[in-house]
Curated annotation (Swiss-Prot):
Binding-site residues, ATP: N52, F53, S54, H55, R91
Any coiled-coil regions, as ranges: none
Metabolic or biological pathway, per its Swiss-Prot or TrEMBL entry: Carbohydrate degradation; glycolysis; pyruvate from D-glyceraldehyde 3-phosphate: step 5/5
Matching InterPro entries: Pyr_Knase, Pyrv/PenolPyrv_kinase-like_dom, Pyrv_kinase-like_dom_sf, Pyrv_Knase-like_insert_dom_sf, Pyrv_Knase_AS, Pyrv_Knase_brl, Pyrv_Knase_C, Pyrv_Knase_C_sf
Any one Gene Ontology molecular-function term assigned to this protein's record: potassium ion binding
Keyword annotations: ATP-binding, Glycolysis, Kinase, Magnesium, Metal-binding, Nucleotide-binding, Potassium, Pyruvate, Transferase
Family: Belongs to the pyruvate kinase family.
Binding sites annotated in the UniProt record for substrate: R50, G264, D265, T297
Name of this protein: Pyruvate kinase
Length: 499
């Protein structure tokens, strides 16, 4: 049955699924930093706590990390911690008097001459990107203050100065952000501040980095190098925020552990209507590659101050799920909003409704057809296991995986049931929180041999599924595990009847 035919069978009175596949990332800020507030977010549906390093000191973020871990421990769950880097940026200098009133139609000059760094006026002001004149051409636009002020470049006055026309009136203040849409900027992937922040993240044992403004695969390596050998197990999720990142997405996906569709800056760097297309491109490519993908920015923004979302916001969240996003992310809604728990609960309900309208079997077949033949052995086993779910109408899958790789491969093929990953590594439990459909169970197997531990882990996975109401006596459960007694590739699939 096609998705269109499936849509014709839907009813608003149908019950929703008994599990939510899409994961929710919450940005932690003044509204939600306390242990009690964090417990509220977790109970409402948060899987990942995001720290935005564009704001706050290391001491502030240290408190957040400690509180997240305390809240998770008190609730007996594993919550991932993500460090979102500030990234490289371009900014204006300072203005005489603190601001400048820019009038539509006026001529102004922007310069990279440091002599104007603190002497800006409406007629001439500083921008701190030294290669500005090399990458910007007449006819290009310069966006300032999140694109609220737009300048059109007319000519190169000299090697440091551009003549521009002001296209709209706006008052700008000191140190406003600058975007150069359509221009190939050559900023480094890791700023001096980022290097210090990344080392802080390594010391604190964060689970993943949301690396800002990644434009090439080489820059993923720069982030990995900055993390150093102690940070080798930290996931790198690349934020795609301009046209270069979209153009180079295939190689970026290959080098990274996942992708974030960072629609805020992306919607300034490319036309807003193109963001819709970019979102579909990035999510689909991640789906085919089996890499987690996050949809972020302004998803339920009105709930920062209002108790209910707009209908358009509800559709936006649902559309991200329909597109195939593993995670949806909240920013100011939970960092500074008045209704942090309510917004997470709303998002969870929207994701669940959208998931219930999907025909996962269509997705499974589409993904399978797009894979190269011959498949790798592990991919073949995992895709066959998902096929077994559909053929037996199994209610859950149990995957034994220390690294989480097998669980991610299974999730790539979108079974229409929850995936329970049993692992002996706590970090794997947390890092799987950005993979759709996967719930993790930590199993301490130190006192057990491998084969004895294997059966105990399978039993632990089945018991977890029963405790969540995913399976009951008489249901089928598909299990994937390794058998180290067999030579060569030894991942095995078996089908259990739940007792």
């Amino acid at each position: 049955m096609s998705q269109l035919a499936h849509n014709l069978t839907l009813s608003i009175f149908d019950p929703v699924a008994n599990y939510r596949a899409a994961r929710i990332i919450c940005t932690i800020g003044p509204s939600t930093q306390s242990v009690e507030a964090l417990k509220g977010l977790i109970q409402s549906g948060m899987s990942v706590a995001r720290m935005n390093f564009s704001h706050g000191s290391h001491e502030y973020h240290q408190t957040t990390i400690n509180n997240v871990r305390q809240a998770a421990a008190e609730l007996g769950v594993n919550i991932a911690i993500a460090l979102d880097t500030k990234g490289p940026e371009i900014r204006t200098g300072q203005f005489v008097g603190g601001d400048a009133v820019m009038e539509r139609g006026a001529t102004c000059y922007v310069t990279t001459d440091p002599a104007f760094a603190d002497k800006g006026t409406k007629d001439k002001f500083y921008i701190d990107y030294q290669n500005l004149s090399k990458v910007v051409r007449p006819g290009n636009y310069i966006y300032i203050d999140d694109g609220i002020l737009i300048l059109q470049v007319q000519s190169h006055e000299d090697e440091q100065t551009l003549e521009c026309t002001v296209t709209n009136s706006h008052t700008i203040s000191d140190r406003r952000g600058v975007n150069l849409p359509g221009c190939d900027v050559d900023l480094p992937a890791v700023s001096a501040k980022d290097r210090v922040d990344l080392q802080f993240g390594v010391e604190q044992g964060v689970d993943m980095i949301f690396a800002s403004f990644i434009r090439s695969a080489e820059q993923v390596g720069d982030v990995r190098k900055a993390l150093g050998p102690k940070g080798r197990d930290i996931m790198i999720i690349c934020k795609i925020e301009n046209h270069q990142g979209v153009q180079n997405i295939d190689s970026i996906i290959e080098e990274s552990d996942g992708i974030m569709v960072a629609r805020g800056d992306l919607g300034v760097e490319i036309p807003a209507e193109k963001v819709v297309v970019a979102q579909k491109i990035l999510i689909s490519k991640c789906n085919v590659a089996g890499k987690p993908v996050i949809c972020a920015t302004q998803m339920l923004e009105s709930m920062t101050y209002n108790p209910r979302p707009t209908r358009a916001e509800v559709s936006d969240v649902a559309n991200a799920v329909f597109n195939g996003a593993d995670c949806v992310m909240l920013s100011g809604e939970t960092a500074k909003g008045k209704y942090p728990n309510e917004v997470v609960q709303y998002m969870a309900r929207i994701c669940l409704e959208a998931q219930s309208a999907l025909n996962e079997y269509v997705f499974f077949n589409s993904i399978k057809k797009l894979q190269h033949i011959p498949m790798s052995a592990d991919e073949a086993v995992c895709s066959s296991a998902v096929n077994s779910v559909y053929e037996t109408k199994a209610k859950a899958m149990v995957v034994l995986s220390n690294t989480g790789r097998s669980a991610r491969l299974v999730a790539k093929y979108r079974p229409n049931c929850p995936i329970v990953c049993v692992t002996t590594r706590l970090q794997t439990c947390r890092q799987l929180n950005i993979t759709q459909g996967v719930e993790s169970v930590f199993f301490d197997a130190d006192k057990l041999g491998h084969d004895e531990g294997k059966e105990h882990r399978v039993a632990a996975g089945v018991e977890f599924a029963k405790s969540k109401g995913y399976v009951q006596t008489g249901d089928y459960c598909v299990v994937i595990h390794a058998d180290h007694k067999v030579k060569g590739y030894a991942n095995q699939t078996r089908i259990l009847l739940v007792e």
